[in-house]
Amino acid sequence: MMPLILLPAVDVVEGRAVRLVQGKAGSQTEYGSAVDAALGWQRDGAEWIHLVDLDAAFGRGSNHELLAEVVGKLDVQVELSGGIRDDESLAAALATGCARVNVGTAALENPQWCARVIGEHGDQVAVGLDVQIIDGEHRLRGRGWETDGGDLWDVLERLDSEGCSRFVVTDITKDGTLGGPNLDLLAGVADRTDAPVIASGGVSSLDDLRAIATLTHRGVEGAIVGKALYARRFTLPQALAAVRD
């Protein structure tokens, strides 16, 4: 069994690395240069970087040139996310040289387009499933978490049947809160698809990472780690050691 892959997150607003609380615009804490942040995680042993253009995700501009610069300076693989919702933005994202892109809102709002790009690009396209549990129902959220995107299980079944190669699963009540991951949600998604699942949101401790790592045999391949690293709850080398024990 492969050890859990850790993807340190670099969220970019106006060229700077930031962290949001529950993905809300305006809730960010700034951590400095995005290039420096990404190179720092590479230096600390990261094999992947999760790079997010929050300006593009919220529809208020783009950091495309900077993202391409970050990808170009890194030797490790990059998963690129934020505002990828049509052929033009997808082509621009892939042109940075990233290993794969995450499609979010477009998978909910434009299912025909999403099915086509899954078919055309295969392993280079992952789909982000941002989940909010309301009265026991698992609802998907789109457009920076402002809109309802339907029932998680229905959409997962559709995307799985279309051959989606990977799902990035976020419990949005947990993201940026250091509140612990939603293990039941991760296991539930992993059990319903043969595609690998990447966990996102809520990681606050090495024990959280060890808990996610117990799900690798069920199909959870990796975990995105953001605020806990920036808040110095643990170092990346400590985290890598914890999931390889």
Swiss-Prot record:
State any GO CC term: cytoplasm
Transmembrane region(s): none
Protein name in UniProt? Phosphoribosyl isomerase A
CDD domains for the chain: HisA (cd04732)
Q: Which GO terms describe its molecular function?
A: 1-(5-phosphoribosyl)-5-[(5-phosphoribosylamino)methylideneamino]imidazole-4-carboxamide isomerase activity; phosphoribosylanthranilate isomerase activity
Hey, which family's this protein in? Belongs to the HisA/HisF family.
The cross-references to InterPro entries, in alphabetical order and at most eight, read:
Aldolase_TIM, His_biosynth, HisA/PriA_Actinobacteria, Isoase_HisA-like, Isoase_HisA-like_bact, RibuloseP-bd_barrel
Q: Give the residues annotated as coiled coil.
A: none
**Keywords for this entry?**
Amino-acid biosynthesis, Aromatic amino acid biosynthesis, Cytoplasm, Histidine biosynthesis, Isomerase, Tryptophan biosynthesis
